[in-house]
Curated annotation (Swiss-Prot):
UniProt KW keywords: ATP-binding, Cytoplasm, DNA damage, DNA repair, DNA replication, DNA-binding, Nucleotide-binding, SOS response
Organism annotation: Cytophaga hutchinsonii (strain ATCC 33406 / DSM 1761 / CIP 103989 / NBRC 15051 / NCIMB 9469 / D465)
Family statement: Belongs to the RecF family.
Protein location: Cytoplasm
Chain positions recorded as ATP binding sites: 30-37
GO BP terms, alphabetized: DNA replication; DNA synthesis involved in DNA repair; double-strand break repair; SOS response
Name used for this protein in its record: DNA replication and repair protein RecF
One Gene Ontology term of the molecular function aspect: single-stranded DNA binding
GO cellular component: cytoplasm
Record's keyword annotation contains Hydrolase: no
Function: The RecF protein is involved in DNA metabolism; it is required for DNA replication and normal SOS inducibility. RecF binds preferentially to single-stranded, linear DNA. It also seems to bind ATP.
């Protein structure tokens, strides 16, 4: 599975753009701020129906315009699929071969994708919400049962919190409605917690293996899932928190409060890990994500690497390149402000590759290399 070509209209700093890609390696070279990351984001959007950069679709529209459109032609098992993502300033639409999905969420996991960025260490430093979001994105691509449960849970948590706020404003609480919300939250929350526990157990040994291959040292690493939802008495704990929920006007127990502890030598890596160890940790986690998605979906995910070599020492860069060349069997996109640094990917590489020079929203393909001339796309 890979993306063959793309067409953008009013997408960030690209008023209009059409590009054809290699099924192997694609390098976006250009200065910082030229639009390399925006190109990666357009591919991510077509795979996951949302940006990894912008918090709203409105922020994706080219300045001064009222809409955007992104089209991608994907190859899967010798068949071509045309994916179109439109936003008219108010409403988004997603179609495959001009046919709309009954629910946009049906697209999640069909064309799996993973992005590595220099900001991935924020997963370690930031709040539990960011870690939950990361694992939710991973598990949702891997398992639609998980995704459906997550959508239901998020819906009912909003409804329940709205009911709690009404009570705070002096309105009587509809206990029948509240009980219905509670039932649905407990039901979908248990599915989410069970799936998180199940998939983390599958992910952990893959992650630990990648960390050991990337790190020059021999630190012990671990990821622990923290939840009380799977405890036998959780339903009673949930009900007992109702008085507190009324006071705070929000639901205080459930999987939306879970966390994932990142550990190195049995200590929180947030406090005890060096900058290099933290970067190695998240890179290993993303590579493990690739392997898990490949196993669950039956497809090679598209791997997007955004300036990932920035601030990595030479040894870790060399190890990362070796692992990517050895284990990443699908399509790869790399952005780099220093293409000479990324050129090591192409040395002794049998994969087809293309280099694109990006300058302030304008993109040109560099002349094909000898390996490209000798390789069919």
């Amino acid at each position: 599975m890979y993306i063959e070509k793309i067409s953008l209209l009013n997408f960030k700093n690209y008023p209009e753009l059409e590009l054809s890609f290699s099924a192997g390696i694609n390098l976006f070279a250009g200065l910082n701020g030229s639009g390399k990351t925006n190109l990666l984001d357009s591919i991510y959007c077509l795979c996951l129906t949302k940006s990894f950069l912008s918090t709203t679709d409105q922020q994706t529209i080219t300045t001064g315009q009222g809409y955007f459109s992104a089209l991608g032609w994907f190859q899967e098992n010798a068949k071509e699929f045309k994916i179109q993502y439109d936003f008219d300033g108010k409403k988004k639409s997603f179609t495959v071969d001009k046919k709309p999905y009954a629910k946009i969420s049906e697209h999640i996991g069909r064309f799996p994708a993973i992005v590595l960025t220099p900001h991935d260490t924020d997963l370690i430093r930031n709040s539990s919400e960011d870690r939950r979001r990361f694992f939710d994105t991973l598990f949702s691509q891997a398992d639609h049962v998980y995704l459906d449960a997550l959508i239901r849970y998020n819906h009912f948590i909003k409804q329940r919190n709205a009911l709690l706020k009404q009570a705070a404003d002096g309105m009587l609480v509809d206990r029948i409605l509240m009980d219905a919300y509670d039932h649905n939250l407990l039901q979908s929350g248990k599915i989410i917690a069970q799936k998180r526990d199940e998939y983390l157990k599958r992910l952990l040994p893959i992650f630990q293996e990648y960390y050991s291959l990337l790190s020059p040292d021999h630190e012990a690493t671990d990821i622990e899932y923290e939840t009380n939802v799977l405890s036998a008495d959780f339903e009673q704990v949930f009900k007992d928190s109702y008085s507190k929920d009324l006071i705070l006007q929000r639901t205080n127990k459930g999987v939306h409060k879970d966390d994932f502890k990142f550990l190195i030598n049995n200590e929180p890596i947030k406090h005890y890990g060096s900058q290099g160890q933290q970067k190695t940790f998240v890179i290993a986690l993303k590579l493990a994500q690739y392997e898990l998605l490949k196993a669950c979906t039956g497809h090679n995910p598209i791997l997007l690497m955004d300036d990932i070599f920035d601030k990595l020492d030479d040894l870790r860069i060399e190890k990362l390149i070796h692992l990517v060349q050895k284990y990443i069997t699908g399509q790869l996109f790399i952005s780099d402000a220093r293409p000479d640094r990324s050129s090591i990917f192409f040395q002794s590489n049998t994969k087809d590759f293309r280099m694109f020079i990006i300058d302030r929203g304008k993109v040109e393909q560099s002349p094909p290399s000898q390996s490209e001339l000798n390789t069919d796309v």
